[in-house]
Amino acid sequence: MKYQKINKLVLFRFISIWDQRFKFESLVNVFSILITTICTFSVIIILSVNDGFKKNIVNILTDLNGDKRIYPDEYLSLSEFDYQQITSIYKDQFKISRFHTKKCIVKTSQNSEAMLWMSTNKDDYFFENIKKYLVDGILTDSTVVAGDLFLEKYDLKLGDYLSFFVFKDNFVESAYKFQVSGSFKTNIPDYDSHLILSTYNLFDDEIEFEYFQINDFENTVSLDKINKKYLINDASEINSSFYQWLNSYDNPIKLLVFFIVVIALLNIINNNYYLLYYKKKQINILLSLGMNNASLKTIIVIRSSLYSIIGCLAAILLAYLFIYLQSNYYLIPLPGYVYFTEYLPVQVNFYYILFIFPFALTTAFLSSILNYNLVSYE
């Protein structure tokens, strides 16, 4: 009974964050918890922003380029018959859009620009989905929409007309003139400055398609039924340069997180060592009074674990509060054409918590035991 009271008294004294009699030691405790909080908060925010940034880029690329594309295998183009055949096989298992593209020269009143002209059917998924990128005007089946950067570069306004010259074998194959009825903005400069969108209802001649685009594709769907007749490209092949860039961008982020984790580790280890080293006399007195090593180690482990939990909990609350506010109210704006988004992207991911607590508690436990053994032999 006597030893239980001593254990409780020692536990209370050791886990106290602030003690008026030992202000410097108390400041060290507060500073240690603060460092744990800052490090954990930084890791959560960095990973959340990184995931949000990648998700934003992938979503834009998927909206514009699809999850997969179907190309002709034996012939130069796809037909309406191919479209009907594929949709009859897979029905509503994914969204499919028909694309007719033209590489052309677009002439304005000031200058000319090489552009990619993409046209689709007004009833296809792409036609409806692209509307979320429209910043002004509308997309109709008798007009075209252009990227925000292109319109800004040549000081064009909605209602202006553009002349299109389509070349084949260095000769003008066809020429068109259509009104600009809207502008879109994806925050990807190449698209917003060199892409024209329309429906293929603009063309009088019979349309053939370069490819079909698949969106909302589930990996459980098998394309074996059409694999032999058509070439099928995955998103990673369509957007290979972007995906390679995203992967290379990922490495510095991982390195930064690693260094922050190392700082957090050193902080926990250093705090435990400081406690044991400067309380060495008190520990020896407690041992001489009859307290056993196991009880003292348990108290040190509880203290270290408690400090780690307090720091991690504070960081988690602050981090997810910030993520919630940023995802709903867009507190931090960004230059769109630099970061491909107009606000700091964040991704809510609670799996970070599953890693943080076990890692912090394991570190606290091991550093407490190792430091205790180290100091006891000094």
Model-found features: residue ranges?
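N-terminal Sec/SRP start-transfer signal
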Residues: M1-T40
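Membrane-proximal extracellular/periplasmic loop immediately following the first transmembrane helix
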Residues: I6, N59-S109, A114-N121, Q326
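Peri-transmembrane interface segments
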Residues: F22-V30, S222-Y278, I285-L286, I299
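Alpha-helical transmembrane segments
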Residues: S26-V28, I38-N65, Y273
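Short beta-strand boundary microenvironments
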Residues: M115-K153
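Basic-flanked hydrophobic alpha-helices used for secretion and membrane insertion
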Residues: M118, Y154-N233
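Transmembrane alpha-helical interface segments in multi-pass membrane proteins
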Residues: Q282-S327
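C-terminal membrane-exit region of the final transmembrane helix in multipass inner-membrane proteins
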Residues: V348-E378
